[in-house]
Design a protein with these regions (language model features):
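Active-site and ligand/interface coordination hotspots across diverse enzymes
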Residues: 1-52
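Short acidic (Asp/Glu) patches
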Residues: 20, 52-59, 91-99
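Short, basic, glycine/proline-bearing loop/turn elements
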Residues: 41-46, 83-88, 113
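Short, solvent-exposed loop/turn segments at secondary-structure junctions
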Residues: 43-44, 77-78, 118, 146-147
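A short mixed-secondary-structure module that forms the rim of ligand-binding clefts
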Residues: 44-66
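Short connector loops at secondary-structure junctions
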Residues: 68-84
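Glycine/proline-rich loop-helix segments at beta-alpha junctions forming the active-site rim
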Residues: 86-166
């Protein structure tokens, strides 16, 4: 029997707003094990069928830790290739993002935060952390910046082990 999970990308769901301005969650599945979650800053170009450097990096971490898949969420759901776009948009969080974060936190075995210093915008990082905890997650980080924010996985060594994030 052929295992389609490893190579067939048709089964990787993503949740967008109807206008696709906001992406609330993105999944990748390659095995039958539990999922890891990554909660980052904001979505870029990855979608149901296309990966970007960040999702590829998160897949590498999750595979190294023995997970069979991952789910990616963001503290801001606005799709933008430049974080500066978050500062000028009327609603960078997105109308359904907090509920999406709650769902991700409930279903993942491990929740790794990595939104970096832009999480200070509107104190969103602190609020998102509270949402994750209220949903039952014990948030982790690969690195904590000097300012106290969880470092983005794209800029962290592949052999880094996540630690509790206060």
């Amino acid at each position: 029997m052929l295992d389609l999970l490893e190579n067939d990308r048709r089964f990787d769901p993503a949740t967008f707003s109807p206008c696709r301005t906001w992406r609330y969650r993105l999944e990748r599945q390659w095995g039958r094990g539990p999922k890891a979650a990554f909660i980052l800053l904001n979505p870029s170009t990855a979608d149901e069928t296309k990966d970007d450097p960040t999702i590829r990096r998160c897949i590498g971490f999750a595979k190294a830790w023995g997970f069979g898949g991952l789910v990616l969420g963001n503290i801001f759901a606005l799709r933008s290739t430049d974080p500066r776009g978050l500062y000028s948009h009327a609603d960078p969080v997105g109308p359904d993002n907090d509920e999406a974060l709650r769902g991700i936190a409930r279903e993942a075995e491990k929740v790794v935060c990595g939104w970096g210093t832009h999480g200070a915008l509107n104190d969103r990082g602190r609020f998102a952390l509270a949402v994750l905890r209220e949903a039952g997650a014990d948030p982790l980080a690969l690195k904590v910046t000097a300012e106290g924010f969880p470092g983005h996985p794209l800029y962290i060594s592949a052999d880094t082990v996540p630690k509790a994030f206060a």
